[in-house]
C-alpha cells in the first residue's frame, strides 16, 4: 500500500488532527502539491479541476452521494472514492423539522405582526402530532428525518427504491406507488439521492397530486423535481407551502419567481450545515483513511 499525502481542501485540520493522521502514516499537505495522492474535497472543486490535478489513490468527497464527478476520469483510474455519509443526518433532519414547525406555528405571520407593532393573537397554530408525513428516500438522512418526525407523534411512511426495515416509519412503500398515495400526506419530504433513476422522479403529474394542505420540502437535488410545476402550484395556492434548499440555478437569479412567493421558504443550499459537522467530518475521514491503509472497504465507498 503506497504512502498517502493528503490535501484537505474542505476541512481545515487542526494540529491535533494532523498529529492523529501522522500516527496513521498519512502526511498532510497545506497546498495542492504535485505529489499529493489523497484529497478530501467538495465535489465542485474536483469537477472543475480534475484535469489539472494529480492522479489520486484516495478521494473522499464532503457529501453523502456523488453526482458531479466522473468516476471513470483518468485521474481517478486507480483511486478509491468514498463519500461522507452520516455526517449531515442530524442538521438536515433538524432543518426539515424546524421549517415544518415554523409553518404550523405561523412564525412568518407573527414575525410580520412584530414588525408592524400589531398585537394580533392567532388561534390557528397546529401540531405536528398526528400529521401524515411521507419521507421519500430512506437513506441515512431520510431515516433521521423519519426518526425526528416520529418522535413528535407524526404518522410517518417511507418511500424507497429498495425494501428496508425501519422502526421509525409505519410502512415502507416502493417509489412506484407514490402516484397512487402522495395525495394523502400533509407533509412530503424529499431526501432522495440524485441518479439516473431518480432524476425528475417528482414529476409534473406527481406534484399535481399533492394534497391542497401539503407542505412540500426538498433537501435533495433540484433535478429531482419539476420546478416550473411547483412554481405554478404555489402561485395558484394549490398547495399550502414549500421549503426548498436547492435550485436548478445557484445562486438563484434575482428575477426568479421563487423570490416573491409568500408560501415558500428558500435557503441557499445550507440544510447540511452545522458547526458540529467539523468533528464528524474528521472522524469520517480518519476512519476511511484507516480502512484504506488496512486494505479494507471504505464506508460509503463508490469505487
Feature names for model-found ranges:
Residues 1-41:
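N-terminal glycine-/charge-rich "phosphate-binding" loop or analogous flexible N-terminal tail
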Residues 25-35, 48-49, 170-185:
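Short acidic low-complexity segments
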Residues 37-111:
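Phosphate/diphosphate ligand-binding glycine-rich loop within oxidoreductases
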Residues 81, 213, 219-303:
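Rossmann-like dinucleotide-binding domain for NAD(H)/NADP(H)
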Residues 110-144, 171:
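Glycine-rich NAD(P)-binding loop of Rossmann-like domains
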Residues 151-168:
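NAD(P)-binding Rossmann-fold cofactor-contacting core
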Amino acid at each position: 500500500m503506497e504512502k498517502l499525502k493528503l490535501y484537505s481542501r474542505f476541512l481545515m485540520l487542526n494540529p491535533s488532527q494532523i498529529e492523529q493522521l501522522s500516527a496513521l502514516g498519512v502526511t498532510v499537505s497545506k497546498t495542492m502539491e504535485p505529489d499529493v495522492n489523497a484529497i478530501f474535497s467538495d465535489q465542485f472543486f474536483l469537477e472543475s479541476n480534475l484535469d489539472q490535478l494529480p492522479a489520486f489513490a484516495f478521494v473522499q468527497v464532503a457529501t453523502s452521494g456523488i453526482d458531479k464527478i466522473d468516476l471513470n476520469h483518468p485521474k481517478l483510474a486507480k483511486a478509491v472514492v468514498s463519500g461522507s455519509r452520516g455526517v449531515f443526518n442530524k442538521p438536515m433532519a433538524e432543518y426539515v423539522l424546524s421549517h415544518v414547525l415554523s409553518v404550523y406555528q405561523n412564525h412568518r405571520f407573527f414575525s410580520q405582526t412584530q414588525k408592524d407593532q400589531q398585537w394580533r393573537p392567532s388561534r390557528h397554530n397546529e401540531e405536528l402530532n398526528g400529521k401524515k408525513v411521507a419521507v421519500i428516500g430512506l437513506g441515512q438522512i431520510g431515516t433521521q428525518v423519519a426518526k425526528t418526525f416520529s418522535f413528535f407523534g407524526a404518522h410517518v411512511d417511507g418511500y424507497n427504491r429498495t425494501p428496508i426495515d425501519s422502526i421509525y416509519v409505519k410502512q415502507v412503500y416502493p417509489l412506484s406507488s407514490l402516484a397512487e398515495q402522495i395525495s394523502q400526506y400533509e407533509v412530503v419530504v424529499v431526501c432522495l439521492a440524485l441518479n439516473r433513476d431518480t432524476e425528475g422522479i417528482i414529476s409534473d403529474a406527481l406534484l399535481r397530486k399533492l394534497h391542497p394542505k401539503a407542505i412540500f420540502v426538498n433537501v435533495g437535488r433540484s433535478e429531482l423535481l419539476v420546478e416550473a410545476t411547483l412554481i405554478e402550484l404555489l402561485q395558484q395556492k394549490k398547495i399550502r407551502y414549500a421549503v426548498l434548499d436547492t435550485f436548478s440555478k445557484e445562486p438563484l437569479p434575482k428575477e426568479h419567481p421563487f423570490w416573491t412567493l409568500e408560501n415558500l421558504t428558500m435557503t441557499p443550499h445550507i440544510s447540511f450545515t452545522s458547526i458540529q459537522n467539523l468533528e464528524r467530518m474528521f472522524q469520517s475521514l480518519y476512519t476511511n483513511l484507516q480502512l484504506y491503509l488496512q486494505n479494507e472497504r471504505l464506508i460509503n465507498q463508490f469505487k
